[in-house]
Amino acid sequence: MKTLPKERRYETFSYLPPLSDAQIARQIQYAIDQGYHPCVEFNETSNAEIRYWTMWKLPLFNCTNAQDVLNEVQQCRSEYPNCFIRVVAFDNIKQCQVMSFIVYKPNQANSGYSGYRY
């Protein structure tokens, strides 16, 4: 019996093929269009028991396009190259987090792919 190689899965999107930069931008733009406030967070590990990640600056309350968020991701990535980076969207009406996904994994940095996700 052939089994699939063990691969660590992080969140819902990790079960899909790697997202391109354009697909990540569309996900972020969807969150902005829904009225959610994006935020960039980073952490050295992505273990499930780690519930609190460090915020990169404050949430982007006045953000109107995905490129602003991607610029913050790039700044965070250059400052903390050995950390996982994720984008989180907050709903200020429900007062909760409604979306989050990892856009950068440090162990894939030298794979030759220039995208945000892998």
Swiss-Prot record:
GO-annotated molecular function: ribulose-bisphosphate carboxylase activity
Tell me which GO cellular component terms the UniProt record holds: carboxysome
* Self-association and partners: Heterohexadecamer of 8 large and 8 small subunits.
Q: Which domain of life is it from?
A: Bacteria
- Protein name per Swiss-Prot or TrEMBL: Ribulose bisphosphate carboxylase small subunit
> SMART domains annotated for this entry?
RuBisCO_small (SM00961)
Instruction: Answer whether the UniProt record assigns the keyword Transcription to this protein.
Output: no
Main location (coarse class): other
Which one Pfam family would you cite for this protein?
A: RuBisCO_small
Any further remarks? RuBisCO folding and assembly commences when the nascent large subunit folds with the help of chaperonin GroEL-GroES. Both RbcX and Raf1 help folded RbcL release from the chaperonin and dimerize. Dimeric Raf1 binds to RbcL(2) leading to an RbcL8-Raf1(8) complex. RbcS displaces Raf1, resulting in holoenzyme formation. The basic functional RuBisCO is composed of a large chain homodimer in a 'head-to-tail' conformation. In form I RuBisCO this homodimer is arranged in a barrel-like tetramer with the small subunits forming a tetrameric 'cap' on each end of the 'barrel'.
Q: Which family does it belong to?
A: Belongs to the RuBisCO small chain family.
**What keywords sit in the KW lines?**
Bacterial microcompartment, Calvin cycle, Carbon dioxide fixation, Carboxysome, Photorespiration, Photosynthesis
From which source organism is this entry?
Thermosynechococcus vestitus (strain NIES-2133 / IAM M-273 / BP-1)
Example GO biological process: photorespiration
CDD domains membership = RuBisCO_small (cd03527)
Membrane in keyword set:
no
Subcellular location(s): the record lists: Carboxysome
Role, per record: RuBisCO catalyzes two reactions: the carboxylation of D-ribulose 1,5-bisphosphate, the primary event in carbon dioxide fixation, as well as the oxidative fragmentation of the pentose substrate in the photorespiration process. Both reactions occur simultaneously and in competition at the same active site. Although the small subunit is not catalytic it is essential for maximal activity.
